[in-house]
């Protein structure tokens, strides 16, 4: 057994010859950006694959978050989770809004609907939950609260590509959902992202906002930005869409092996599949109980690293611990006990389509032995 580096993720790459052939067509057309044919085709193909009405492509996964808040004219306070990647909360801050942190449900890692109402004030205008690790939020519980108080709901669905609940896309929940197509994700366009909306009017507004606010050659209808996806990455995305199902199934098989081996290891827990959910196996987080396992999370993380097996403490530290946000009242430790416990115990194991049986076994040997 060799000692090659096992990475926590690996990008899904289209066949290079196939991609080169598409690049040749783009070169010949000389249309490399600005809503070209590949861009249009990818939006249509993604809407069909994801079972959603409208898709708007972006150049990365952060800009859809920023633009969604603009599109819905969100002001004041936005309720969100501290247990996420920093882009979630940064998008709120960049829009001049105040993030209000609410604790998570330890059973899922997602925003706990039972704790949302207590955080609502007269300045609250929206809720921004995250489908953490691609595990669906309690969308009904969240929507019931949003409807009661007249709040908008924007889902950060960066991890939730292709996830369904009882045959329905999780991306259809809320007012808007956003996706990341970063190289680390299940489906990628190198860098990229998308926004999912439910009606043509919102789709049109989003498309204006991501193109400087232009509604025509000489008409600007609002203060937009430039966040369009180019033709090269659109072509790359179309090719990757053809192989993403096989990649997800390969991840599924890795998850099965991890669960079989780790289920009897005292002090190590993990999430099982949720009933009725079509998962995408974006990540495989484990949680270390130091007292039962006999080793802290950080000690296990270091042991793995020494063996050339890279895990990721994802999400540690909490967003609420960063200097920009730690002074917020809602960032207080006593307000977020479940989130702190999860952040202090998590390691995401290597999880991607290219892991071999030997890679999986080396990873497990670090933990089981």
PLM feature segments, named:
Residues 1-32, 350:
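N-terminal "arm"/small-domain region of PLP-dependent enzymes with the aminotransferase-like
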């Amino acid at each position: 057994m060799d000692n090659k580096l096992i990475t926590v993720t690996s990008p899904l790459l289209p066949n290079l010859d196939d991609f080169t052939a598409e690049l040749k067509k783009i070169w010949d057309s000389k249309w490399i950006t600005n809503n070209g044919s590949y861009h249009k085709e990818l939006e249509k193909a993604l809407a069909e694959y994801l079972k959603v009405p409208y898709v708007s492509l972006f150049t990365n996964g952060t800009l859809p978050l920023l633009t969604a808040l603009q599109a819905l004219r969100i002001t004041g306070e936005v309720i969100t989770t501290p247990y996420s990647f920093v882009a979630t909360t940064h998008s709120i801050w960049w829009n001049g809004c105040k993030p209000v942190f609410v604790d998570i449900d330890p059973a899922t890692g997602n925003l706990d609907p039972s704790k949302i109402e207590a955080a609502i004030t007269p300045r609250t205008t929206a809720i921004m939950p995250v489908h953490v690790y691609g595990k669906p939020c309690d969308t009904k519980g969240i929507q019931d609260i949003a409807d009661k108080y007249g709040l908008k709901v924007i889902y950060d669905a960066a991890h939730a590509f292709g996830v369904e609940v009882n045959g329905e896309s999780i991306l259809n929940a809320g007012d808007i959902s956003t996706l990341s197509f970063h190289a680390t994700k299940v489906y990628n366009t190198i860098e990229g992202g998308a926004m999912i909306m439910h009606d043509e009017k919102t789709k049109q507004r989003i498309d204006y906002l991501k193109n400087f606010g232009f509604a025509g050659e000489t008409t600007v209808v609002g203060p937009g930005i430039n966040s369009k996806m180019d033709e090269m990455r659109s072509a790359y995305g179309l090719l990757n869409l053809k192989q993403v199902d096989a990649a997800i199934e390969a991840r599924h098989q890795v998850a099965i092996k991890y669960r079989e081996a780790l289920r009897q290891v005292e002090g190590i827990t993990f999430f099982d599949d949720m009933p009725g959910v079509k998962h995408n196996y974006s990540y495989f987080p484990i949680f270390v109980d130091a007292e039962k396992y006999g080793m802290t999370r950080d000690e296990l993380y270091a042991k793995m690293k020494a063996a050339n097996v890279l895990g990721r403490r994802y999400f540690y530290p909490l967003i609420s611990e960063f200097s920009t946000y730690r002074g917020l009242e809602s960032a207080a430790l006593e307000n977020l006990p479940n989130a702190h416990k999860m952040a202090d115990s998590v390691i995401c194991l290597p999880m991607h389509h290219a892991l071999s049986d030997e890679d999986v076994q080396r990873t497990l040997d670090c933990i089981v032995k």
